[in-house]
Amino acid sequence: MILIIYAHPYPHHSHANKRMLEQAGTLENVEIRSLYHLYPDFNIDVAAEQEALSRASLIVWQHPMQWYSVPPLLKLWMDKVLTHGWAYGHGGTALHGKHLLWAVTTGGGENHFTIGSHPGFDVLSQPLQATALYCGLKWLPPFAMHCTFICDDDTLQAQARQYKQRLLAWQEVNHG
């Protein structure tokens, strides 16, 4: 099962993430958990989140990039849900062997994220990749949708279909 942990503080304003979720939602065995919908008060149900994670084979952290990082509720989710003794540390093997995909949208162009004046995705992904590896997850190459503020609908739809294809390809390789 693919579990998408979706974290967008303003989901009604996101054309890109909306299209990505629409495409992903057409696949079988996909569960989407919208953190800002489930926890508008930031009071996370840790047991429910850990149960959802335990059912998943692929975990996707999908969100808009905010200040070169994750939105605040996703960071809190990581702090609360990925606990010692469950996700890492002594006895913390609940996530071992599962895959993790970082699916991120950005307002800037892809060239904005090249080493030079701004850090590249290989640098930006390091904290998430380190978290994944620390929890025994298998890190997959990120999926990034760029220029989301200026893309026309056809471009957004095409990129959302690429996202769906990425998830479908994972399903085919990992579950025949």
Swiss-Prot record:
- Could you tell me one molecular function GO term of this UniProt entry? FMN binding
Which BP terms from GO are recorded? positive regulation of potassium ion transmembrane transport; potassium ion transport
- Report the catalytic activity: a quinone + NADH + H(+) = a quinol + NAD(+); a quinone + NADPH + H(+) = a quinol + NADP(+)
The record ties this protein, via SUPFAM superfamilies, to: Flavoproteins
Name any cofactors this protein relies on.
FMN
Q: Which residues bind FMN?
A: 8, 14-17, 65-68, 105-108
Q: Highest taxon of the source? A: Bacteria
Where it sits in the cell: the answer is: Cell inner membrane
Q: Which residues cross the membrane?
A: none
Specify the signal sequence span: none
Q: What is the protein's membrane topology class?
A: Peripheral membrane protein
Under which EC number(s) is this enzyme classified? 1.6.5.2
Query: What keywords were assigned to this record?
Result: Cell inner membrane, Cell membrane, Flavoprotein, FMN, Membrane, NAD, Oxidoreductase
Cross-referenced Gene3D superfamilies:
3.40.50.360
Q: What is its main location?
A: membrane
Top-level EC class as recorded in UniProt: oxidoreductase
A GO cellular component annotation in the UniProt record: plasma membrane
- Similarity annotation: Belongs to the NAD(P)H dehydrogenase (quinone) family. KefF subfamily.
HAMAP family per the record?
K_H_efflux_KefF
Describe its function.
Regulatory subunit of a potassium efflux system that confers protection against electrophiles. Required for full activity of KefC. Shows redox enzymatic activity, but this enzymatic activity is not required for activation of KefC.
Q: How does it assemble?
A: Homodimer. Interacts with KefC.
Protein known as: Glutathione-regulated potassium-efflux system ancillary protein KefF
Annotated organism of origin: Salmonella newport (strain SL254)
Upper classification of the source organism reads: Bacteria, Pseudomonadati, Pseudomonadota, Gammaproteobacteria, Enterobacterales
Gene of this entry: kefF
